[in-house]
Amino acid sequence: MAVGIAMLALATTLFTTLSAELAIDLHWVAHIQIFPLALAGSIAGILAWLALTLVFGRIYCSTVCPMGILQDVFARVPRLGRRRRFRNGYRYEEPRNKFRYTWLTVVVGCSVAGIALAATLFDPYSAFGRICSEILLPVWEWVCGAPVLVASWLAFGIAAATLVAVAAVAWRSGRLVCNTICPVGSTLSLVSRYALMHFDIDTDVCVNCGQCGRVCKSKCINMADHVVDASRCVVCFDCVDTCHEGAIRYTYRRKRLSVPMMQPVTPASTAMSRPSSQASPAPKAAGKPEKPQAESGVALLDRRQFFATGLVIAATPAIAAASRQRKRIEAITAKRRPLEGLKPVVPPGRRSLGNFLQKCTGCGLCVAHCPAKVLRPSAGQLGIANMLHPVLDLDASYCRYNCTRCTDVCPTGALTPLSTEEKHIFVIGKASVESANCIGCGLCVRRCPRGAISMKARKADQPGPSVLIASVDSDECIGCGACQYICPATPVKAIGVSGTDFRQ
């Protein structure tokens, strides 16, 4: 448990630290996670974990996976102080093999077909990363006095729903998530059932007290047959610690079948009836006193009505002036042309858009460590299948010219590391100008780090309010978005960046 808590603390620090140096020093925590290793194409890393699982069982789930360790934390809460609700503990349940392996097939099939959303939502590392970057990081920024920013309310909602669901399931059913919908846990279970080291119950010593089964978060200890289902066991050693007789041991000796036969357990069902409650009738409203009437039968104005009438009369000229101003603004706005055809811009460092979409897990590590806060989890800009992949919000900020932070921390190879010189020429988009919106202020010219924008005389066939108009040199533009961010034209900006490499 101590190793798991240390790994949980390191993973949490990786996503929430405000120090760039510390984030880069801790990037190895993300690089040893199984799903990022698979997407990065690290055959050696995957084989190493499979070999460790074949020897020791699912130690990854109890010592390395941050989401698994977080479930252990939630599962331990009812046991603190020996609360009455945990008096009966856990009970053995049959494995849900049909469901979990069918679900594993669906997730793998979606990933192969290019539908990354299933893996993005259910990969334990990515789900934990969103919890940290969307929930814990804003809280930590507020504590440290830094500007607090929720990158995406959609991602925040998904992270909050994931946290609540995982906490509730772990509170009541331990590691049920790991042994049903987690694709990593289901994959490792195919190997761990044949693990060399396993938990064995010595029937000559066991007194059938059932303590080991009551503390087993995986609900995999069958006391009727005195066997432990190695495909679900996460090697947490809680059963060994609680057995006072020393009857259960972690050993290479095998006194049972590789895949033990499980006895069906009929869960007890209880029906709770709640008495119906009758709503009490609402009290009758007290009658309002009638207004005093003048002798002629005309109602008298009280003080409130008098002042309200006076305010309406006094405000009438101001309302009319505001209406005329609104019409003038609408007339000017009608001449504005929206920037059409702009495609989403993805972070620098990708080999191609297809490679980026295939390898990105939507963990949010690049979003959490972007110093410009320009990265956002997508909400459909890249398609529903690629939701939560990072995109640039160039109206909120822009990509810093010398920054390579996102490429340094990406664990899957979706973004390859770039040097500062490589970043200076890496094209993520191209800027374009809508002449009807340009006011000729020249701010984009002064902000462009590449000198790709200049002011030129407006042609006769180009409508607009100014004599000069911004012009973009496409050969020099890299799509950093500084021009779009600084453009003061309202309500529609005069310059915008469209992402490149959108070949299907």
Where would I find each of the regions flagged by the language model?
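Non-ligating segments of multi-cofactor redox enzymes
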Residues: M1-H226, S231-R232, D238-Q504
